[in-house]
């Protein structure tokens, strides 16, 4: 069993145990109607968009620096981030829906609920907590599940980042005709990362979609290496959480898009 299989099994058990029903009862409704969409920001700029992530740990990291997360989110916005990603998995990533709820109130930026979605109730909880965007990982869903969850999320006026890791998954994603596709440079089965993976996967990408390179971006050189693939944005977590001066680091990542 891979780490990804283990995480997905854990999510299914949480569903059976009523974890998400309880969250729907205890979370307060958050109004985010004033927030702009992430897609509108992708539409309006010739620079790479940055989804800046809040994370505490992962299966490959014991612990990240202990930050004032409310301030971190404000610093992300002040230094040019276009959206914020917040991990809500408690067991493997040290996040929570309560954290998402607290932090979405600290920013005018749209917030991505970063989790392993396998059921509509998880989308309900993300929406109630104040997410503007949800993540669907192609690898853990059948085509029918993906279609059902995508349509359900968009019916709730949520944006969807559809995540792929290989060319086969990219072709499956295209069937949905999603607006935004993320290419994860991290193999979620083995949790190994290669930042140039984006270039390989998008060699023959189709037009009419926005593409986000996710994971493994450490510096401006990494961005320069992947921007040639024709991406529209980046999702960055660990490097930003470790950074001691976001005002120097984050704006430098927003290179001009390369049209292919």
From Swiss-Prot:
Pathway: Amino-acid biosynthesis; L-tryptophan biosynthesis; L-tryptophan from chorismate: step 4/5. It is an enzyme of class 4 (lyase). Its EC number is 4.1.1.48. GO terms for biological process: L-tryptophan biosynthetic process. GO terms for molecular function: indole-3-glycerol-phosphate synthase activity; phosphoribosylanthranilate isomerase activity. PROSITE patterns: IGPS (PS00614). SUPFAM superfamilies: Ribulose-phoshate binding barrel (SSF51366). It catalyses: 1-(2-carboxyphenylamino)-1-deoxy-D-ribulose 5-phosphate + H(+) = (1S,2R)-1-C-(indol-3-yl)glycerol 3-phosphate + CO2 + H2O. The keyword Membrane does not apply. Belongs to the TrpC family. This is Indole-3-glycerol phosphate synthase. The gene is trpC.
């Amino acid at each position: 069993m891979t780490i990804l299989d283990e995480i997905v099994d854990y999510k299914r058990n949480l569903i059976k145990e009523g974890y998400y029903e309880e969250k729907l009862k205890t979370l307060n409704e958050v109004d985010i109607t004033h927030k702009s969409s992430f897609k509108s920001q992708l539409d309006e700029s010739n620079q790479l968009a940055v989804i800046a992530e809040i994370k505490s740990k992962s299966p490959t990291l014991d612990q990240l620096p202990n930050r004032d997360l409310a301030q971190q989110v404000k610093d992300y916005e002040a230094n040019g981030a276009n959206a914020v990603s917040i991990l809500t998995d408690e067991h493997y990533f040290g996040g929570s829906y309560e954290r998402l709820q607290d932090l979405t109130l600290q920013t005018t930026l749209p917030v991505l609920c970063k989790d392993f979605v396998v059921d509509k109730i998880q989308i309900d909880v993300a929406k109630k907590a104040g997410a503007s965007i949800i993540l669907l990982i192609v690898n853990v869903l059948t085509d029918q599940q993906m279609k059902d969850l995508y349509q359900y999320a968009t019916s709730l006026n949520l944006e969807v980042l559809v995540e792929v890791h290989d060319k086969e998954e990219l072709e499956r994603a295209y069937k949905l005709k999603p607006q935004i596709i993320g290419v994860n440079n991290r193999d979620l089965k083995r949790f190994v990362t290669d930042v140039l993976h984006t270039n390989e996967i998008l060699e023959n990408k189709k037009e009419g979609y926005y593409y986000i390179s996710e994971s493994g971006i450490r510096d401006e050189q990494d961005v320069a290496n992947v921007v040639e693939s024709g991406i529209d944005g980046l999702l960055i977590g660990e490097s930003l959480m470790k950074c001691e001066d976001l005002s120097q680091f984050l704006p430098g990542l927003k290179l001009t898009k390369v049209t292919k």
